[in-house]
Amino acid sequence: MKIALGIEYNGKNYFGWQRQEKVHSVQAELEKALSFVANEKIEVFCAGRTDSGVHGTGQVVHFETNAIRPEKAWAFGTNANLPDDIAVRWAKEVPDDFHARFSATARRYRYVLYCNKLRSAILPYGITHTHLDLDEHKMQEAGRFLLGENDFSSFRAAQCQSNTPWRNIHHLNVIRRGNFVIVDIKANAFVHHMVRNIVGSLMEVGCGNQPPEWIEWLLAQKNRKLAAPTAKAEGLYLVQVTYPEHFELPQMPLGPLFLADEL
């Protein structure tokens, strides 16, 4: 049988999602817990491999198993064997043609900035603190230049292994909630560090160092060296993965928990 899971995790203590030799990863912890519940070795496949320090509230994985368990056992049983910073949010049996990565039609991220002269002791790791006074309206205006299908070479990490820099951004919204500025971005897929590189450059616009039209110019240059530094990992969340409706996967609040679902 094939099972899909919705996964939430705090990426602070992990060297990214992907299982690797001699480093702590979310995938390795999840596979260990699932293998215990299934009483056999389990390998999971995810919708998106997040980097070191990046969080997830809407990660989706699938795995195949010979073990027959009710859906609630995959959720509650696995959670009982996971560390506190990883949790299963839902479990569902899926058809054989489902694949967490290749069946996905879109991914959605939220980047959370805490704008204050002084740092927070309550939320030190799930946000990116900045002393800059960001203008979310200018950031929103700049973001519209990135909508649609474009070559995102200017926002692509040098080590990116994707065959193409072309991606299609469905929406990019910048919202303020008190001292929090949230960049909410959805696309068919993302090149390596794309969200963090976009956020870093939007911050240059938000603080007044660059005009909104600078983002349009950057996009046209197709040169990563001209853009702003990459924003820190700690403020980034994978909040949603979209699939065709016929798979009937559960819909959960996007999160993170301290933000309203709809922004």
Swiss-Prot record:
Q: Which PANTHER family match?
A: PSEUDOURIDYLATE SYNTHASE, TRNA PSEUDOURIDINE SYNTHASE-LIKE 1
The reaction(s) catalysed by this protein are:
uridine(38/39/40) in tRNA = pseudouridine(38/39/40) in tRNA
Q: Which gene encodes it?
A: truA
InterPro entries (UniProt xref): PsdUridine_synth_cat_dom_sf, PsdUridine_synth_TruA, PsdUridine_synth_TruA_a/b_dom, PsdUridine_synth_TruA_C, TruA/RsuA/RluB/E/F_N
Residue sites binding substrate per the record: Y109
Q: Which CDD domains match?
A: PseudoU_synth_EcTruA
* Family annotation (NCBIfam families): hisT_truA
| The keyword Disulfide bond is annotated on this UniProt entry | no
Indicate whether tRNA processing appears among the record's keywords.
Answer: yes
List keywords of the entry alphabetically. Isomerase, tRNA processing
On assembly, the entry states:
Homodimer.
**List of catalytic residues:** D51
Q: What's a GO biological-process term for it?
A: tRNA pseudouridine synthesis
Which HAMAP family is this protein grouped with? TruA
Main function: Formation of pseudouridine at positions 38, 39 and 40 in the anticodon stem and loop of transfer RNAs.
User: In the record, which residues are listed under signal peptide?
Assistant: none
Q: What is its EC number?
A: 5.4.99.12
**Molecular function GO labels:** RNA binding; tRNA pseudouridine(38-40) synthase activity
Family listed: Belongs to the tRNA pseudouridine synthase TruA family.
Listed name of the protein: tRNA pseudouridine synthase A
For this protein, the record's Pfam families field holds: PseudoU_synth_1
